[in-house]
UniProtKB/Swiss-Prot annotation:
The gene is Csta. Coiled coil: none annotated. InterPro entries: Cystatin_dom, Cystatin_sf, Prot_inh_cystat_CS, Prot_inh_stefin. It is found in: Cytoplasm. It comes from the Eukaryota. This is Cystatin-A. Transmembrane segments: none annotated. It comes from Mus musculus (Mouse). CDD domains: CY.
Length: 97
């Protein structure tokens, strides 16, 4: 992997779903939406001074949202929602944002 570059897309794991679940409330607050369905589909990572997770979320009704979550290197499992893109489709590629 190239430092700073994005990995190839991989199917979401239980760990990635847990990361997404931990920032769901923050995303709902920022988008003023309530997500009945919030399922991680796939993800990419980027190594920086921690790890950025770019996660494609199925939010129901054929709609998808891309979220970016930063996990620091403190070992305390601190997570921060640092970006999101709404109105995505299942076929939209995860890209840097």
């Amino acid at each position: 992997m190239i430092p700073g570059g994005l990995t190839e897309a991989r199917p979401a794991t239980a760990e990635v779903q847990e990361i997404a679940d931990r920032v769901k409330a923050q995303l709902e607050e920022e988008t003023n939406e309530k997500y009945e369905i919030f399922k991680a589909v796939e993800y990419k990572t980027q190594v920086v001074a921690g790890v950025n997770y770019f996660i494609k979320m199925d939010v129901g009704g054929g709609c998808f949202t891309h979220i970016k979550v930063f996990k620091d290197l403190s070992g305390k499992n601190n997570l921060e929602l640092t970006g999101y893109q709404t109105n995505k489709t299942e076929d939209d590629e995860l890209t840097y944002f």
